[in-house]
A protein has these predicted regions:
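Active-site helical microenvironments for divalent-metal-assisted chemistry
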Residues: 2-137
Length: 137
């Protein structure tokens, strides 16, 4: 049992290191370190996959890392599948269609992480709701 916990924690730590690397030097709309939001979303997760996906949910959109890069760094297929759904190509898909696609996928990890993402975005409250939605369109 102890070995399993160490393995799980090591994978979560590796995922956290990837997120820290990807968001190094970035700031959010409020001027805070960008990593704080993915950390909060990850810590809201109810499973290892949700924690890891939460930590990485903004990496593809907000850094030069791709899903393939993440896969090459050892990120599990379950997390990659959720990240593929959570990565929003704003040029091709409107925000509400993007959210509908996540829901329609039935991917529980992606759905929970998106809910946690929205919850944390609304909690922060410094940037208006309208500005947050506009930044996603």
């Amino acid at each position: 049992m102890a070995a399993h916990i160490v393995t799980v924690m090591t994978k979560i730590e590796e995922t956290l290191k990837i997120a820290l690397e990807a968001h190094a030097g970035q700031e959010d709309l409020d001027g805070n370190p960008a990593i704080l939001h993915p950390l909060a979303v990850g810590l809201m997760g109810n499973s290892d996959a949700e924690i890891k996906t939460g930590f990485l949910h903004d990496v593809v959109e907000d850094s030069s890392m791709t899903l393939e890069d993440l896969k090459n760094k050892g990120v599990e297929d379950e997390v990659i599948a959720a990240l593929a759904l959570l990565s929003h190509d704003k040029e091709k898909v409107g925000y509400f269609e993007y959210v509908e696609n996540i829901i329609a996928s039935g991917n529980v990890t992606a759905i929970h992480v998106k809910l946690n993402d929205l919850h944390h975005n609304l909690q922060r409250g410094k940037v208006s709701y309208e500005a947050a939605v506009a930044s996603n369109d």
